[in-house]
């Protein structure tokens, strides 16, 4: 198997983690006769520092041309004061939208061996918890309008969550 993996090292301590993940992938490749090639891509704070943009079009294209993306954590205190459209997290939203990654599955299960560590009541844990939450990632509140208005002499925050029929049907099929 030959695969090209886009590497986004991410921000703060994340590059150290991604570097070790690449070492693991290389060991897997050697053991199983695979070949992984890597393409460096920038996103988040490191892209802001290098290009002034959380995900330049050329970096998104590198990801689209790859077989997969290994992504480190995005954001950190250094970029917290930036305007909303220039924050590192906007790069992540654009990556998801650009690659059509609109959903993720969030499993919730309490294994018997870990039941005592659960913050939930024992009576609930003893009944068993095993379900999956499907989370929509690129519509609604992520790309809706966010604004503050004056109403009756006080500030009111408004966050719209627009979803098209297509987006709702698509997430419902997961």
Q: Where in the sequence are the language-model features?
A:
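Anion-binding alpha/beta catalytic cores of soluble intermediary-metabolism enzymes, centered on
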Residues: 1-12, 30, 35-37, 42-174
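Short N-terminal binding/cap micro-motifs at the start of the first secondary-structure element
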Residues: 13-18
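Short catalytic helix/loop segments, enriched in acidic residues and glycine
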Residues: 22-32
């Amino acid at each position: 198997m030959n695969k090209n993996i886009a590497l986004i090292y991410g921000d703060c301590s994340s590059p150290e983690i991604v570097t070790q993940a690449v070492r693991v992938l290389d060991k897997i490749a050697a053991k199983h006769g695979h070949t992984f090639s890597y393409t460096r891509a920038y996103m988040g704070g490191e892209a802001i520092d290098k290009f002034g943009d959380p995900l330049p079009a050329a970096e998104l294209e590198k990801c689209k041309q790859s077989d997969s993306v290994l992504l480190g954590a995005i954001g950190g205190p250094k970029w917290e004061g930036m305007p909303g459209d220039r924050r590192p997290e906007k790069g992540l939203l654009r990556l998801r939208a650009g690659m059509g990654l609109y959903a993720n599955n969030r499993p919730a299960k309490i294994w018997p061996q870990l039941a005592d560590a659960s913050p939930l009541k024992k009576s609930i844990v003893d009944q068993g918890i095993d379900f999956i939450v499907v989370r929509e990632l690129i519509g609604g509140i992520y790309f809706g309008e966010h604004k503050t208005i004056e109403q009756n002499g006080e500030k009111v925050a408004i966050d719209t969550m627009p979803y098209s029929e297509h987006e709702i049907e698509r997430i419902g099929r997961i």
